[in-house]
Amino acid sequence: DRGFVTLKVRRAIEDGLFSGPRLLCSGPPITTTAGHLHYCGLHADSLDDVRRAVRGVVERGADYVKIVATGGMMTPGSNPRRCQFSPEELKVAASEAHRLGKRVAAHLLGVEGIQPCLQAGIDTFEHCSWMARDEAEEFDFRPELAREIARSGITCGHTMVGLYRDLLPDREAPEAVQVEQLEQLRALQERFARMRELGIRMMLSSDAGVAGTRFDRFVDGLEVAVVAMGMSPLAAIEASTRVPAEALGLGDEIGTLVPGKRADIVAVKGDASADITALKRVSLVMRDGRVLHSASTAA
């Protein structure tokens, strides 16, 4: 988000200007001057800055708070292996958000940022890629740290569309690209499997909005999780519905088909619990029990 545009779209949907999904928005991510995603416009370089930034996004109507704990891959000069905030700043972000009744998500690529985010009380880790601090190593997976994440109850979101969608059976990628992606995929497979084995709560996400990752291709991530990561179709569906709903504190409202919950429903042609690609054959979309799309009327 830049300029709180997602909150404006959310308001337009709520006011009935056009149909759309249920949007839960964080507004611009809180980062540092010259930090990852600095061009989104919300910088914080001290404890007071962090406190002010959290209060500011909540004042504007954010549903939750996002802080960019480590550098990232798509910002020139940013170092994804290193923390951008001090442990004290991360604690202030979490405590201030929680005081205001909001949960906090942390963009987290480097292993250096995991312990400070754990100690700060961050609610969800986005990516959690275990990138090594030393550039001589690519990744640094630490089982005891993973067990600590599991014990804390933190949910980790894995973005599995991006590079990996070109490895799906119906895609054709240049051979050189496939070789590079396969190497990355094998490393991801190992970390993903170990995190699941050690009991970390996992949710599937997309990082949609970045180059090459479209909002309408979310299902590709579920297919990658099943085809390449060894998840069952039903586990992948739960990791993109029930688990994230619970991670957002909305498990009593959405995420499962239970009497009394909001009727946010997608119906597909086929049995997605057996064949994950059935999710590509959408026949009905409902929000709050109201039909937004029906294949029978779309034509």
Task: Identify the residue ranges that each predicted region occupies.
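Active-site glycine- and acidic-residue-rich loops that bind
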Residues: 2-7, 41-51, 105-108, 129-143, ...
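Catalytic cores of alpha/beta
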Residues: 110-119
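Glycine-enriched alpha-helix->loop->beta-strand junction motifs that scaffold or abut catalytic
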Residues: 118-124, 150-155, 172-176, 198-201
